[in-house]
Amino acid sequence: MGQKRQRDQKGSGFQSKKRKRGANSSNADDKDDGWDGIVGVEDLNWKEVALPDRLDDAEGFFGLEEIEGVDIVRPEGSGEIRFKAKAGKPKKSILKNKTIPQEDKTFDDEWEGFSDGEAAQETTTTEPTEEPVQTTNEETEVKEKKEPKKKEAKKEVKKDAKNAKKEPKKKDLPSQKDKDIKPGLSFAALQDAEEDDGVDISAWESLGLSPEILNSLSKLKFSSPTAVQKSCIPPILDGHDVVGKASTGSGKTLAFGIPILEYYLEKKRRETKNKDDKKETSPIALILSPTRELAHQLVKHIGEVITHAPGVNARIALLTGGLSVQKQQRLLNGADIVIGTPGRVWEVLSGGQGLISKMKEIKYLVVDEADRLLSEGHFKEAHEILAALDREEINDFPGAEEDESDDEDSKTQRQTLVFSATFHRDLQQKLAGKGKWTGSDLMNKQESMEYLLKKLNFREEKPKFIDVNPVSQMAEGLKEGIVECAAMEKDLYLYTLLLYHPKHRTLVFTNSISAVRRLTQFLQALQLPALALHSSMAQKARLRSVERFSSPTADPSTILVATDVAARGLDIKGIDFVIHYHAPRTADTYVHRSGRTARAGASGKSVIICAPEEMVGVVRLAAKVHANMANGKRLPLESLELDRRIVSRVKQRVTLAARICDANIAKEKVSAEDNWLKNAAEELGVDYDSEEFDERQGRGRGRGRGRQQRERQASSISKAELAGMRAELKQLLSQRVNVGVSERYLTSGRVDIEALLRGEGNASFLGQVDPLGF
């Protein structure tokens, strides 16, 4: 046992000696290094702190510098503060290049100058060459000149081996012919050539567009330009500021999108000719939109032209709320066209560094739906953006005069393009007010221009005002109607109108978010495919609703219940019917709501469900919108008479669906209020009794007491009663609406048996129903 212990002691002693040797060797390396890593303030690699573009009050904090990854060291016996690198960070990373200690660069022998062979190699490498392989050899030779002479022979052998490995790679380098081929035209061009050539675009040739854009228009089946495109594209290409007014669905997006892409192609050709390859490019256009849906639609339409145009690789950055700010900032770095809503655009520009100065270099500023963006009390960020683009920075530093002159030049080069279907400020006034009202011509050119000149800083004193349809703001193929009913019967008449128009993609507009939620559940209870869209929804949910509604594979009877967030710019093919559940508050809102149908020369219908208290506003609306009509009708909207038999037969369905919907909404609201009160009571440490609280609330008086009582009664409906109402409603919906036909003796009435068997006609009714004469 003693021998074993003796051996263990020797082994442990041997291991400890090894550890000591390792420690001594590391210490020896540190000693050989000759530098402990502690430096002064002057030796650190300080970096200047970048301030944001928008800083209202800096309070003198300019010229600040910072450094990361250092620890503060106070040597004993000295009051001077010194620094060293943090653990795990290289010591040299915190130093300036000139302050790296020279002891690290220890050589084995002295440098004895250049040899004759090296001089010859230097003369050969100074000759210009185009092959990238030789440039790498030149770098290695420059490094060899700094090495000692004893290591020269070994490095020459290594260099020859590297060259031997690199020589076969020369075969893989592209030839001069391959360099001339554009990367965007590889196999995509062959695929496009195999497809059909598109439509005849001879009508576009008079506008002087490039072959790339004409090719894209041909593939997109745009055979001829619309009136607004034919009138606006030439002056925009000539460099004029343009104010374009046209009816909804007339193609205003391409009226300003095509000139922007033409300028992009011209800029690209200029850079290719001058061989100017700049990695950092500033945007050429900023397009502002009032809603997120319109911004996404602008990206889609302009992106389709870019996709089908060979050689057009313009990048579009979309800046809208509801999405990641960091991702949008990254997209903005290399973007050519910026499209967004004013709130998010201003958030990105004001929080970034150097973004506002980049935006000052844009060639085009496009304000889409300008009357909405520039209206009083709305979109404060839009005014901030316009002010920032026109603001001149005054500096006291050397060269400030040159910067100011550059800003003035960029300001004079920027074109301002304004588009909308309505411009006059009077159309934005509320229709239900008691103020003075006249039915005179309110849409003249002079007042519209004065309104815009106050809001925007045009380059020209008098921009070109192009009014494609000065007489009416409504589309030519649009039919307008009105249904008069009691205020409590709007649900009934809405359902009846939907039954009259099966397989029609319908858009229902309301004035409140709560009405959207209630109507969506109400229509879904009636087994109708209804979707909701309002501003309180998450961005992904909004995009999902629009996608489901506009999908070609969707049910043709899909109904979208929306607020005025969908009234402007939403271009969805196949919308046949627009219903105004609430009368619009302003005339311009009615114009844009009705403009969702009858787009691009198609036909469509727009119907207002009007209660007696809304009639005054509707009369004023019709007089303002149709002020220039030849006939002097007091109400130019056509009055629709629905079949009273159908209205009475579907009333039971509507009543059950409304009760089910109101009960569900009331239960959700009561449970949410109870949860909030319960949580508040727990935080305060008091007892909460829901019944006692309801009794105290019921004793009070005031506005809204009747609504609260109805909600309380609706929430008290049990699950069994709800299930019974759902079963009864399901049974009613399984049957067709009988309009006076004997179900036992079908042949005795006005029933076409063959049409029933073939599935023709309106499947909602049993019997002959005359369509609305409208």
UniProtKB/Swiss-Prot annotation:
Subcellular compartments: Nucleus, Nucleolus
Catalytic activity: ATP + H2O = ADP + phosphate + H(+)
Start and end residues of each Helicase ATP-binding domain: 233-441
Motif (Q motif): 202-230
GO BP field: rRNA processing
Positions of region (Disordered): 1-37, 87-183, 689-718
EC number: 3.6.4.13
Low complexity composition-biased segments: 118-137
Biased composition (Acidic residues): 106-115
Classification via SUPFAM superfamilies: P-loop containing nucleoside triphosphate hydrolases
Keywords: ATP-binding, Helicase, Hydrolase, Nucleotide-binding, Nucleus, Ribosome biogenesis, RNA-binding, rRNA processing
Domain Helicase C-terminal: 493-643
Residues the record lists as binding ATP: 246-253
Record bears the keyword Disulfide bond: no
Function: ATP-binding RNA helicase involved in the biogenesis of 60S ribosomal subunits and is required for the normal formation of 25S and 5.8S rRNAs.
Protein name: ATP-dependent RNA helicase mak5
Gene that this polypeptide is encoded by: mak5
